[in-house]
Amino acid sequence: GWLNVDVLPRAEHDLMLDLTQPQAWPLQANSPTVGPLVLDEGQAEVIVANNVLQHVGDLPRLMTHALQLLKTGGRLVIEVPYEHAATAWQDPTHVREMNENSWLYYTDWFWCLGWYEHRFAVESAGYLDIELREAPRERAAFMKVTLLKVETTLRERMTARTMSAGIELPEDVPVPTRLYRPRQPAPALSVVS
């Protein structure tokens, strides 16, 4: 089933929860509509964020929580106003607008967010017109993007560790049991005559 999570008391939500704030998983909560529930890492198959991301203050934290809550292979389905649309900034509650490059930190530069084991991959991306029909970029009012939670590869984790401030080996790199230490050359003999 679906669980409608929102931060606004006036929204018709199942659970009032601010995913831009620190959260500890598993999270036990009591919903007025579904009763006691537990939210935990790797639990969700799909998260839908329809016209949400442009409103949140701490988008990296919200995206981190979405990544944590999704199963590997789970989808984050996003619909946001397109930055270049004439209507993008008409809502005074928007704190950002999105474009094609808005997803790079979550897909390609994931280590900037402290992610190492999982990241997002763009599964699909397209544009919608003001009536929410598929449209070419020139007539776009919205973007619709589906991000897929994927495991990072060993190469990606090595790159991520290299790009991070503290360099560490990923957990799946074998630790050498013997260290190679070259022999020190013997001291040169000096001949005294």
Spans of features found by a protein language model:
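S-adenosyl-L-methionine-dependent methyltransferase catalytic module, highlighting the catalytic core
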Residues: 57-61, 65-67, 71, 75-193
